[in-house]
Amino acid sequence: MRFEQPLEEGRLLRRYKRFLADIESAGGERLTIHCPNTGSMLNCMSEGCRVWFSRSNDPKRKLPGTWELSETPQGRLACVNTARANRLVEEALLAGDIAELAGFTALRREVAYGVENSRADFRLEYPTGALFIEVKSVTLGFDETAVAAFPDAVTLRGAKHLRELAALAREGIRAVQLYCVNLSGVEAVRPADEIDPAYGKALREAAQAGVEVLAYGAEVTTEGLHLARRLPVRL
């Protein structure tokens, strides 16, 4: 996935009201842009950190740009635009780059399922039946180690999705929790038990119920993203 237009570089002044960020562009222009991330963005929003943003040409838009990338304190690039994760996964699925999920005959997005009124990010159809996928975007790295973690904030919704996937797996339906790691320099993924122990517990229970837990790491550059390789998940 290449960015639709060249990204512009700047530095972060502050993030506030969840969806807003003030930045200063490389040319000294101060802008308020859209922050497309509802998480805590730990290690992605240090004051003064380098950021990259896409600028909109739509005159009807209230904000002139969207925050796309951050440089972490460890010098890694993180894609903070969580909407990119689903697009990146879909691109990889259609290209056959996720070997464990290859061979499907149809793909549907945002499919309702489960007793808790959830929506799967993707439903794939195979000659043998359906498969449901939940995608999570991972950008959290605590230190110099090459292990990323999820979530970066307590997520009741994420735990609900795991319960729904586990229920499918118990019925003999393939269910997948797929972590899209949009952080460079990562070699493995784990649940962030120190942030949300309930999520970590739900993930382990889902895996025991038969949910397939996969992680794929993206190559993150200022030109674009590419889901490059499978990463181990340390439960």
UniProtKB/Swiss-Prot annotation:
Gene3D superfamilies: 2.40.50.580, 3.40.1350.60. It comes from the Bacteria. Disulfide bonds: none annotated. One of its GO terms (molecular function) is DNA binding. InterPro entries: SfsA, SfsA_C, SfsA_N. Pfam families: SfsA, SfsA_N. NCBIfam families: sfsA. Belongs to the SfsA family. PANTHER family: SUGAR FERMENTATION STIMULATION PROTEIN A. HAMAP family: SfsA (MF_00095). This is Sugar fermentation stimulation protein homolog. It comes from Pseudomonas aeruginosa (strain LESB58).
